[in-house]
Design a protein with these regions (language model features):
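Conserved hydrophobic beta-strand positions in leucine-rich repeat
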Residues: 72-76, 94-98, 118-120, 137-142, ...
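Leucine-rich repeat
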Residues: 68, 89-93, 109-115, 131-137, ...
Length: 360
């Protein structure tokens, strides 16, 4: 899941030798000074300087400074970096990748105001206030940290993609100002109130799964949404989704849903997941003829006849329902996977060919 959120952020990186680190004690205004004093600075800072020298493929500070001062992209992912102070003078950087390190202090980044992409996922960050000055950011990835206060992000109105999953966020009020967002990834947090999302009408991708959401009324205004993940919440009323007619992918499993009639209008859906709910009447799905994947596992469904119109289905998951008659599924000739396990089927003959498609 995580890779799908920002696989486009990959940059090449050298295979670098790693060095032990500790806390910074001295500061300098530019990389050249950091480098020339690398034998007297803290082990943490020295480690970062050594990495930058290796990326530059030189041991000469002047040459490395010249090269690094002219590069616009740096990938420092997974290099055991703790102290990023030696980066503070590289104001020309537009893309900076710092994922999978041990960074807790982002203060050295506050002067890098030309950054358009910043990735600092899987670190030890709780305070993101230094980022408030980075107003040119378009893509910001901060997942898998210890962030609870996202108020510094309110100033970053040029953001088009914001990734904050696996944090400790409950209040998302600051995002209401980020009206240029196309993608917002907030799963695995502690969010219950999504009212601030109402203004984000440019969103086409929204991940909110595994939170504490019950009221999805604010989503009704997000008419450009194409992908919406809401599984693992406390949702029962789907009415606000009726207006989201551009949706292609909707994932709602593990909620408290029984009435799916609001989904009737979502005729552009290609993938729909309604597993682990309390749905018995699936007749509203008749109109969703563009569906290629439909997941209805773990529901109290007994009548599957409404599915016979969905003849574009490649995958149909009916695992663990109460279906006894599957003859109506014989019209689904494009199926490549049909999961019927856990149903009281009387005549266990696969309704489509070949029989290997069916799982009983």
């Amino acid at each position: 899941m995580k890779e799908n959120c920002y696989t486009y952020l990959n940059f090449p990186i050298s295979h670098l030798k790693l060095i032990d680190a500790a806390q910074p004690m001295t500061t300098y205004n530019n990389f050249l000074d950091w480098c020339k004093h690398k034998e007297t600075i803290s082990p943490n800072a020295k480690h970062t300087v050594e990495i930058l020298l290796q990326i530059s493929d030189t041991s000469e500070c002047d040459r490395a400074n010249e090269l690094l001062s002219n590069t616009t992209e740096l990938n420092l992912k997974n290099l055991q970096i703790t102290d990023i102070s030696p980066l503070s003078s590289f104001a020309q950087l537009t893309n900076l990748i710092l994922g999978s390190n041990q960074i807790s202090n982002l203060a050295p980044l506050q002067s890098l105001t030309n950054l358009k992409t910043l990735v600092v996922d899987v670190n030890q960050i709780s305070d993101i206030s230094p980022l408030s000055s980075l107003i040119n950011l378009s893509i910001l990835v901060l997942d898998t940290n210890q962030i609870s206060d996202i108020s510094p992000l309110a100033a970053l109105t040029n953001l088009t993609a914001l990734v904050l999953f696996d944090n400790k966020i409950s209040d998302i009020t600051p995002v209401q100002a980020l009206t240029n967002l196309n993608a917002l990834i907030l799963y695995n947090n502690q969010i219950s109130d999504i009212a601030p999302l109402r203004s984000l009408t440019a969103l086409d991708t929204l991940y909110l799964y595994n939170n504490k959401i019950s009221d999805i009324t604010p989503l009704a205004s997000l008419k450009n949404l194409k992908t919406l993940f809401l599984f693992g919440n406390e949702i029962s009323d789907l009415t606000p989704l009726a207006s989201l007619t551009n949706l292609n992918k909707l994932v709602l499993f593990q909620n408290k849903i029984s009435d799916i009639s609001p989904l009737t209008s979502l005729t552009n859906l290609i993938e729909l997941n309604l597993g682990n709910n309390q749905i018995s009447d699936i007749s509203p799905l008749k109109s969703l003829t563009n569906l290629t994947e439909l997941y209805l596992f773990n529901n109290p469904i007994s009548d599957s006849s409404a599915l016979q119109a969905l003849n574009n289905l490649f995958l149909l998951d009916l695992y663990n329902n109460q279906i006894s008659d599957i003859s109506s599924l014989q019209s689904l000739q494009k199926l490549t996977t049909l999961d019927l396990r856990g149903n009281p089927i009387v005549n266990k003959i696969c309704p489509v060919n070949p029989e290997s498609i069916c799982r009983f």
